[in-house]
Amino acid sequence: MEQPVLVIAVPRDGVAQGQNGKDHQAFESLVQTLLDFDKIPATLCFYTEGVRWLTHESPFVEELREIRARGADIVACRASMAAGGLLSDLAVGRLDSADRIDDMLIGAQHAMVV
């Protein structure tokens, strides 16, 4: 499998971080920036609390679906989803292992954490 050029890691959900909503604002800014592009050749990896952005309760489900429709691969950590009891709540993206997400981050030409 070809390694992605850009991998964006999203480990937080912006709710319980005690940073006055800064994580939520950072994620919202990322979503809006990605939506400025017609094609999005990136992989977004969600793990730990960040998997909550991909559930039916997320305020960004429709935006994330649009980002996926524009070419982004959206990956949720299966173990994180299971630990949070969220496996049946996945609204957008696909499940993969933590090891595979690590491989994507390590193998990417560019990686960032939001």
Feature-to-residue mapping (PLM):
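Solvent-exposed alpha-helices and their adjacent loops that cap or buttress functional pockets
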Residues: 1-2, 37-38, 67, 103-106
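N-terminal beta-loop-helix "entrance" segment that forms/cooperates
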Residues: 43-45, 50-60
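Charged helix-capping and loop-helix junction motifs
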Residues: 23-29, 58-62, 94-95
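Conserved mixed alpha/beta catalytic, RNA-binding, or beta-rich assembly cores of soluble enzyme
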Residues: 4, 9-48
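C-terminal structural segments of small proteins and small subunits
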Residues: 84-114
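Short, well-ordered alpha-helix to beta-strand connector turns
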Residues: 41, 71, 108-109
